[in-house]
């Protein structure tokens, strides 16, 4: 059904999965085919993200099991102070290194509508991923951009913002008011 919907409307936004839907609990599967279908999915994901005023979206959020997400930080109603970046399609991502320095930030999620949570995350990460052509890329990301990457990466692990906010380390840091070293 998902591929049929993609073929019928190549640039139309896709429906966004919300908390409680099984796809959001599943581990994403590795992308092996870097073809027009993948590019089309990325295009529709981008349209879905823009329509929902997001700064990122993961394939499971549009009912696809693939290990793929898009980051496109830009100031908008939900994130007025977001830095501006060109949209980046991230395929088969890996977080290679996480800094010990943590920072808290407010996050929302297209799959947890109307809610915001304060989440602690590593301030800097080193990542590895493939682009739409299948070429491996390496980057060091900091601040808000690192936060987006980690948030979307969580979706590929079957973790939504709601689950992340309930993890013991989040509760401990909230009680302490500072990151644990």
Swiss-Prot record:
Q: Which SUPFAM superfamilies does the protein's record reference?
A: Peptide deformylase (SSF56420)
Note on cofactor: Binds 1 Fe(2+) ion.
Question: What are the BP-aspect GO terms?
Answer: co-translational protein modification; translation
Identify which residues the record assigns to the active site: 152
Q: Provide the residue positions that the database annotates as binding Fe cation.
A: 109, 151, 155
EC annotation from Swiss-Prot or TrEMBL: 3.5.1.88
> What is the enzyme's main class?
hydrolase
Q: Which residues form the signal peptide?
A: none
Give the molecular function GO annotations. metal ion binding; peptide deformylase activity
Q: Which domain of life is it from?
A: Bacteria
Reaction(s) catalysed by this chain's protein: N-terminal N-formyl-L-methionyl-[peptide] + H2O = N-terminal L-methionyl-[peptide] + formate
Record key words, sorted = Hydrolase, Iron, Metal-binding, Protein biosynthesis
Kindly list the cofactors needed: Fe(2+)
Q: Which family does it belong to?
A: Belongs to the polypeptide deformylase family.
Q: Function, please?
A: Removes the formyl group from the N-terminal Met of newly synthesized proteins. Requires at least a dipeptide for an efficient rate of reaction. N-terminal L-methionine is a prerequisite for activity but the enzyme has broad specificity at other positions.
Name of the featured protein: Peptide deformylase 2
What is the protein's species of origin? Answer: Shewanella oneidensis (strain ATCC 700550 / JCM 31522 / CIP 106686 / LMG 19005 / NCIMB 14063 / MR-1)
């Amino acid at each position: 059904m998902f591929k049929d919907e993609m073929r019928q409307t190549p640039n139309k936004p896709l429906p966004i999965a919300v908390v409680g839907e099984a796809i959001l609990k599943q581990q994403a599967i590795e992308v092996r085919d870097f073809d027009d279908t993948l590019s089309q999915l990325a295009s529709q994901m981008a349209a879905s993200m823009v329509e929902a005023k997001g700064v990122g979206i993961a394939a499971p959020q549009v009912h696809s099991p693939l290990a793929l997400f898009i980051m496109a930080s830009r100031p908008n109603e939900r994130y007025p102070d977001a830095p501006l970046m060109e949209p980046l399609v991230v395929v088969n991502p890996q977080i290679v290194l996480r800094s010990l320095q943590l920072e808290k930030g407010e996050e929302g999620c297209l799959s947890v509508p109307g809610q915001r949570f304060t989440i602690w995350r590593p301030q800097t990460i080193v990542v590895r991923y493939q682009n739409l052509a299948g070429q491996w890329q390496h980057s060091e990301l900091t601040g808000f951009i690192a936060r987006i990457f980690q948030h979307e990466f969580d979706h590929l692990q079957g973790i939504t913002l709601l689950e992340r906010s309930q993890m013991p380390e989040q509760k401990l840091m909230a009680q302490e008011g500072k990151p644990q070293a």
